[in-house]
Curated annotation (Swiss-Prot):
The UvrABC repair system catalyzes the recognition and processing of DNA lesions. UvrA is an ATPase and a DNA-binding protein. A damage recognition complex composed of 2 UvrA and 2 UvrB subunits scans DNA for abnormalities. When the presence of a lesion has been verified by UvrB, the UvrA molecules dissociate. GO terms for molecular function: ATP binding; ATP hydrolysis activity; DNA binding; excinuclease ABC activity; zinc ion binding. Forms a heterotetramer with UvrB during the search for lesions. The lineage of its organism: Bacteria, Bacillati, Bacillota, Bacilli, Bacillales. A zinc finger (C4-type) spans 252-279, 738-764. HAMAP family: UvrA (MF_00205). It holds the Pfam family UvrA_DNA-bind. It comes from Staphylococcus aureus (strain COL). This is UvrABC system protein A. Its main location: cytoplasm.
Length: 948
């Protein structure tokens, strides 16, 4: 019987050239090929898109409007499709409330565990809270000052949606006269209609009393009635005082600290019942940072030391500052750091109640006199941020503010009550500070009583199962409270991968995009085993991947190429990895079999005396690291995932240099000192973020070559005759562009129930320019024709104009010859965007004082692309510049001049320097995981060289 398969016929999405392919079902399929060859076009834009579209099509029109409909991919037929799930890197939640624990649903089970077997303790006296008797409640109320007026309330509805009409009617029938609804006392017969879509709290007024001797019996009776009405809860409304809360279940006998019935929502920082009231469950507060307000303390007040008050169109703040200095005799020509502590305090935090009179010039002209108390710069920024109706003002003020842990909950996000409940000796805030491996160990060995163990058994099973999956995909170093927005693309993808395994679905088509990103070689085997486990459940996995180990582990390997862009889009080879390795046409096969490889350099640049010295780096998990980064060579920072590479390079090195050199507002991670910054004059972070967020941005505009091309067109005879300047050939401004589409070339048509449709502009036929502009030509081509050329074509076309050719040649050198000059920035992959940035740096004149920082530049790159990338990076170093790379890819690591290896483990087990030196030095370091794998690669390459 024929094995089931997915049959694709006539796929033409993007650069795919009408390809037909049959893929075996229930197998691990890896698609590979050069960057831009068409892998994602086949995997995501064809197979996944059609699988998803067919599923959505089966839903009702009502449901479809919420899901949004996917376009039908450009393909003739696809047979044998299963429901498709895509696990890519782009869908990480940036919501500050989203954490590793919430995304994986582990937190839901932990909350349930605390609600079922948690033991509440009084935070003031550290004793377990037992249930309160009516007598204890009476005694506590009688301690109130004599003649205090009180109302006994029975909470019958606690923060629940609904209009609650029936309940209110029943309360009236029982003879109760008053209610407190959402804090307001109302007559039971005059209750306004409640909005059923809002949460409400309803309390019955059971009795109203004045505290005095002799009311104990009546008080006890009323308390019993209230407890019966509200299932054991009682609120005492102390007139002109704070409410007292009592519970038949939980309260401290010494201080009366009481806690309501334990329920899961009490432990949720996304619920008003559990969230810290100060920070609303965010764990952080935006606070004015003095270091951002006065970034350069060597400046004087006259030189603009207080940055937010540097003069603008109104001189209100500079005049106020001048007057304050006159009143308090503060020298405005003295460096800020040399002012006395008292003087700095007055400037930053205000002058108390003393009023100051001054006259300032208004924005519209004219002068005005004001008398006011000087509040201080810090309170002024805070007030304007919180109270200003202007979005612009709030944005400007936020530049001088930093997220700091909330003072009430100390960053734990939860209320005092929630943090007073313990299981196994820890509260929920302490548990989520554990890394995944620590939490797994804790829950496997948790010590519970026999009764609690019976209750918690099923919950613990779910928690341990999910933690095990996360551990198995190499994420053991992540803490449970880590914010989702701070995860790398690879980490976020592996979290979703672990969640999917936990769901135990079968018969599904999973499409994954480079799950090995950010993963050290040590953890690769665990990831591959996870993928195989998903396959063995009866699922089909299509993985777009360049990783050597993953390709070798595939059941079926598809090599797409042979080149990129126009030169790709074909199936070069497919079959088992062994079959592809034997195929001489397959570039991937040649690299896999060792016939082609990236060579180890014959000569490594020695580390010179010129260096950046970092001392006492303590950002995140770094343990007071001291390290030297040599200048004018290529340094690669390595280490297992979570070892502290990004903390050292991005948080400490980049941010501190950006702050000093670029005068950036970023706040670096903690460190004692950094020396050697004066040897640099430029720091550039070349990441994989888009080169522009609108279709108007493209490689030509980003690299600046489009300016030169517009100059050429403005110099043509036709342009001179017509009086056209350079601006005429811009599609961003009026004049030369087509006004029907405002220079976009496309028009958006909104469709209800269907996705928005983009159609070429009928007026300019998608050319972006008006007819008159397009009549100007250079060598027979108009400006729109130039934008449609590939970089390779344009390089030949402008070969006689050195300025343009030089810039275009750098794009060819980084492997982007296939991209069109006018390709929209939004359609470039992360790897392509990064290489456009590299190209724009390459054609600039080097000073030899620049430092380039790259975080995993091999993401999305084939081995052949990596080879090209390394040549480009070496060109930067040959100019005398410095390159610092965070990388796991052994081909990059083996070509480095110098390596800084962090570890030894991830998370709390990392954050120290394991070894530094040349790749050969690291390979000899027994304690280095990187060294172990590097040694194998260096020996294999040496063997291959000798065999030749």
């Amino acid at each position: 019987m024929k094995e089931p398969s997915i049959v694709v016929k006539g796929a033409r999405a993007h650069n795919l050239k009408d390809i037909d392919i049959e893929l075996p079902k229930n197998k691990l399929i890896v698609m590979t090929g050069l960057s831009g060859s068409g892998k994602s076009s086949l995997a995501f834009d064809t197979i996944y898109a059609e699988g998803q579209r067919r599923y959505v099509e089966s839903l009702s029109a009502y449901a479809r409007q919420f899901l949004g409909q996917m376009d039908k991919p450009d393909v003739d037929t696809i047979e044998g499709l299963s429901p498709a799930i895509s696990i890519d890197q782009k869908t990480t939640s940036k919501n500050p409330r989203s954490t590793v624990a919430t995304v994986t649903e582990i937190y839901d089970y932990i909350r349930l565990l605390y609600a079922r077997v948690g033991k509440p303790y009084c935070p003031n006296h550290n004793i377990e809270i037992e249930s309160q008797t009516v007598q204890q409640m009476v005694d506590r109320i009688m301690e109130l000052e004599a003649r205090t007026k009180i109302q006994l309330l029975a909470p019958v509805i606690a923060h629940r949606k609904g209009s609650h009409e029936k309940l209110i009617e029943d309360i009236g029938k029982k003879g109760y006269v008053r209610l407190r609804i959402d804090g307001e006392i109302v007559d039971v017969n005059d209750v306004p209609t409640l909005d059923k879509n809002k949460n409400h709290t309803i309390e019955v007024v059971v009795d109203r009393l004045v505290v005095k001797d002799g009311i104990e019996t009546r008080l006890a009776d009323s308390i019993e009635t209230a407890l019966e009405l509200s299932e054991g809860q009682l609120t005492v409304d102390v007139i002109d005082g704070e409410d007292l809360k009592f519970s038949e279940s939980h309260a401290c006998p010494i201080c009366g600290f009481s806690i309501g019935e334990l329920e899961p929502r009490m432990f949720s920082f996304n619920s008003p019942f559990g969230a810290c009231p100060t920070c609303d469950g965010l764990g952080q507060k935006l606070t004015v940072d003095v270091d951002l307000v006065v970034p350069d303390k060597d400046k004087t007040l006259n030189e603009g030391a207080i940055e937010p008050w540097i003069p603008t169109s109104s001189d209100f703040y500079p005049t106020l500052l001048k007057r304050v200095c006159e009143v308090y005799k503060i020298n405005m020509d003295k460096p800020f750091k040399k002012l006395t502590e008292r003087q700095r305090d007055i400037l930053l935090y205000g002058s108390g109640d003393k009023e100051i009179e001054f006259t300032f010039t208004q924005r519209q002209g004219g002068t005005r006199k004001r008398t006011m108390v000087f509040e201080g710069v810090v309170p002024n920024i805070s007030r304007r941020f919180h109270e200003s109706p202007s979005e612009y003002t709030r944005e400007m003020m936020s530049k001088y503010m930093t997220e700091l842990p909330c003072e009430t909950c100390h960053g734990k996000r939860l209320s005092r009550e929630a943090l007073s409940v313990y299981v196994g000796g820890l509260n929920i805030g302490e548990v989520v500070e554990y890394s995944i491996s620590q939490a797994l160990n804790y829950y496997k060995n948790i010590d519970l009583s026999e009764q609690d163990q019976a209750i918690a058994n099923q919950i613990l099973k779910e928690i341990i199962s999910r933690l095990t999956f996360l551990n198995n995909v190499g994420l053991e170093y992540l803490t449970l409270n880590r914010a989702s927005g701070t995860l790398s693309g690879g980490e976020a993808q592996r979290i979703r991968l672990a969640t999917q395994i936990g769901s135990r679905l079968t018969g599904v088509l999973y499409v994954l995009d480079e799950p090995s990103i950010g993963l050290h070689q040590r953890d690769n085997d665990r990831l591959i085993n996870t993928l195989k486990e998903m396959r063995d459940l009866g699922n089909t996995l299509i993985v777009v991947e360049h990783d050597d180990d993953t390709m070798r582990a595939a059941d079926y390997l598809v090599d797409i190429g042979p080149g990129a862009g126009e030169h790709g889009g074909q199936i070069v080879s497919s079959g088992t990895p062994q079959k592809v390795m034997k195929d001489k046409k397959s570039l991937t096969g040649q690299y896999l079999s060792g016939k082609k490889r990236i060579e180890v350099p014959e000569y490594r640049r020695p580390a010179s005396d010129r260096k950046i010295s970092i001392r006492g780096a303590r950002s995140n998990n770094l343990k007071g690291v001291d390290v030297d980064i040599p200048l004018s060579i290529m340094t690669v920072v390595t280490g297992v995932s979570g070892s502290g590479k990004s903390s050292l390079v991005n948080e400490v090195l980049y941010k501190s240099l950006a702050q000093k050199i670029n005068k950036s507002k970023v706040k670096p991670g903690l460190y004692d000192k950094i020396e050697g910054i004066d040897q640099l004059d430029k720091i550039i972070d070349i990441d994989q973020s888009p080169i522009g967020r609108t279709p108007r941005s493209n490689p030509a505009t980003y690299t600046g070559v489009f300016d030169d091309i517009r100059d050429v067109f403005a110099q043509t005879n036709e342009a001179k005759i017509r009086g056209y300047q350079k601006g005429r050939f811009s599609f961003n401004v009026k004049g030369g562009r087509c006004e029907a589409c405002k220079g976009d070339g496309i028009i958006k048509i909104e469709m209800h129930f269907l996705p928005d449709v983009y159609v070429p502009c009928e007026v300019c036929d998608g050319k972006r320019y008006n007819r008159e502009t397009l009549e100007v030509t250079y060598k027979g081509k108009n400006i729109a024709d130039i934008l449609e050329m590939t970089v390779e074509e344009a390089t030949q076309f402008f070969e006689n104009i050195p300025k343009i050719k030089r810039k275009l040649q750098t794009l060819v050198d980084v492997g982007l010859g296939y991209v069109t000059l006018g390709q929209q920035a939004t359609t470039l992959s992360g790897g392509e965007a990064q290489r456009v940035k590299l190209a724009s740096e390459l054609h600039k004149r080097s000073t030899g004082k620049s430092i380039y920082i790259l975080d995993e530049p091999t993401t999305g790159l084939h081995v052949d692309d990596i080879s090209r990338l390394l040549k480009v990076l070496n060109r930067l170093v040959e100019n005398g510049d410095t390159v610092v790379i965070i990388e796991h890819n052994l081909d990059v690591i083996k070509t480095a001049d110098y390596i800084i290896d962090l570890g030894p483990e991830g998370g709390s087990g990392g954050g120290t320097i394991v070894a530094t030196g040349t790749p050969e030095d690291i390979a000899q370091t027994k304690s280095s995981y990187t060294g172990k794998y590097l040694k194998e690669v260096l020996e294999r390459d040496k063997q291959n060289t000798e065999d030749k």
